[in-house]
Amino acid sequence: MSTNKVNKERTFLAVKPDGVARGLVGEIIARYEKKGFVLVGLKQLVPTKDLAESHYAEHKERPFFGGLVSFITSGPVVAMVFEGKGVVASARLMIGVTNPLASAPGSIRGDFGVDVGRNIIHGSDSVESANREIALWFKPEELLTEVKPNPNLYE
């Protein structure tokens, strides 16, 4: 894989209704931009039940599925796509683990979260998940296609 292709890896992030209500969107975007990732898609919406169920389809048989769908559809979500080298893995590290109380200080959930059911942000857990989630939340024309990364970031 060429370096250019690696630098163009994309991930899906969504600031959940609790993070939006608490005014954390700007802080979260700033963290990813300061890391060197490029914001290539951004929108705010209240997800439909169908979108939420499709997004969390892997959890359909889990006991928390109904509550998760209800929560994510309870208010505005800020959906984002970031691009950059290793962005999927880096974004997950920056988010922290699912339970905010177990997340390291310095991570988004470690710094701002207090409850596993209100953990502020979703991030894709693999390149494959990112591709699926991006396609679910964004139309191709809603994403920037020609992004020139800062030349000081990569060799």
From Swiss-Prot:
A GO molecular-function descriptor: metal ion binding
* Reported cofactor(s): Mg(2+)
Q: What reaction does this catalyse?
A: a 2'-deoxyribonucleoside 5'-diphosphate + ATP = a 2'-deoxyribonucleoside 5'-triphosphate + ADP; a ribonucleoside 5'-diphosphate + ATP = a ribonucleoside 5'-triphosphate + ADP
Q: Which residues form the active site?
A: H122
SUPFAM superfamilies under this entry?
A: Nucleoside diphosphate kinase, NDK
- EC number(s) per UniProt? 2.7.4.6
Q: What is this protein called?
A: Nucleoside diphosphate kinase, cytosolic
**What is the organism of origin for this protein?**
Dictyostelium discoideum (Social amoeba)
- According to the entry, what is the taxonomic lineage of the organism? Eukaryota, Amoebozoa, Evosea, Eumycetozoa, Dictyostelia
**Gene that encodes it:** ndkC-1
